[in-house]
């Protein structure tokens, strides 16, 4: 079903936008039917205006540069125009369930997000979703709105993560408004247009499992297999193969997160993507000083989702997904043993998480240290570095970036990284072992530094950088949002003109707190 008739009413300067969006059509997920979703228009957003726009993401959708300047662009991506769409083309909120902070929360769902549809361009399909579009049947006690600060953070982090090479949802734009929204204080509303191949979560499978809807569970699994893992159809047990794909993509994602010091903050099962994307940017954080127990979410008082816990939590979440898939597993076995065999098969596949994650993280850490040749003792060298970093709260990003300056011959390049450690003697003891290890490498210092700088970013979205952009945006100055976005699109480049964005956080940054309140 094409949505083009519903937006063809756009006229004047917006006709180009209407033409560009003629490929917007009903998503394959929406075609699964009403048991999966509820259709409704977005809530009105008063006097919407553009805050941020990603030309890169627009290009994925086939949107030409300049369309964001059309007078009605903000009207469309605020959701305001959806009130004129026919009933069969209305946006939709999907229903799911899940475990939150380790506790079964029952039915959840898109409480403030609405799917617009799907765009196909250059052989790729992307779903569009408006986050902050108003109340839905799944909002529970929420108002369905997102606020400007959290919307800017999601926009910036979506783009930053993509350019770090980490699978993620993307962000097309942020639309702001002066419409008040009450949180701890009164803030203003905003809408982020998210873009992703799929927004299906572990929690979708948990929902239909918990409601004993095996028919819907099968339809959902078939949808994911058809769209993303068609090779699973050739397996002896296609649904077990789907679980295996989730194990692989989730393990790989955890390697990516841990390697850059990223902490998600709310790794509930309803915030886990079935296709291995980073999804639902809330109280996330890139750590500054290294702390293995770093907690980015002020609401996480027990540290369930601390940095060091993320791989373990990912495995736990996969266990919940496996449980949700159990009714579909083991169909190749005799009925009398099917249940037991399904559990055995699921446990075996889940065991692959550690086998995937641990070696991949070891390889990544060797790359971050510039160790091309694997040697016995490399793991110990990495672990001792983290111990010294933890004891000194040495900056995560700057430590790894500046290690590229260390020479295998002498201490002439040590200062930039050595100065990050209060206990210089402890660092010297480690770096001398590191230098000895580098002497076993065949690459020269220059070649090694180039390779290290390709995996150790100079620029990440530190909280204080986001906060500065947010404060200016609240004053209607959006230049810092776009400046920061541009810098984060080149995280591995030197960009000497932006050196201030790569430095240690200012003292005031230590007082910043992020929580689930957005």
From Swiss-Prot:
Alphabetically ordered keywords of this record: ATP-binding, Magnesium, Manganese, Metal-binding, Nucleotide-binding, Nucleotidyltransferase, Transferase
UniProt-annotated binding residues for ATP: 109, 111-112, 131, 143-144, 194, 201, 280
Region of interest: Disordered: 498-518
Signal peptide positions (record): none
Binding-site residues for Mg(2+), renumbered to this chain: 271, 280
InterPro entries: SelO (IPR003846)
Coiled coil, from the record: none
Active site location: 270 (proton acceptor)
Catalysed transformations (reactions): L-seryl-[protein] + ATP = 3-O-(5'-adenylyl)-L-seryl-[protein] + diphosphate; L-threonyl-[protein] + ATP = 3-O-(5'-adenylyl)-L-threonyl-[protein] + diphosphate; L-tyrosyl-[protein] + ATP = O-(5'-adenylyl)-L-tyrosyl-[protein] + diphosphate; L-histidyl-[protein] + UTP = N(tele)-(5'-uridylyl)-L-histidyl-[protein] + diphosphate
Pfam families: SelO (PF02696)
Cofactor section: Mg(2+); Mn(2+)
Record EC number: 2.7.7.-, 2.7.7.108
GO MF term (any one): magnesium ion binding
Function as written in the Swiss-Prot or TrEMBL entry: Nucleotidyltransferase involved in the post-translational modification of proteins. It can catalyze the addition of adenosine monophosphate (AMP) or uridine monophosphate (UMP) to a protein, resulting in modifications known as AMPylation and UMPylation.
NCBIfam families found in the cross-reference section: PRK00029.1
Family stated for the protein in its record: Belongs to the SELO family.
PANTHER family the record matches: PROTEIN ADENYLYLTRANSFERASE SELO, MITOCHONDRIAL (PTHR32057:SF14)
Stated name of the protein: Protein nucleotidyltransferase YdiU
Organism this protein belongs to: Paraburkholderia phytofirmans (strain DSM 17436 / LMG 22146 / PsJN)
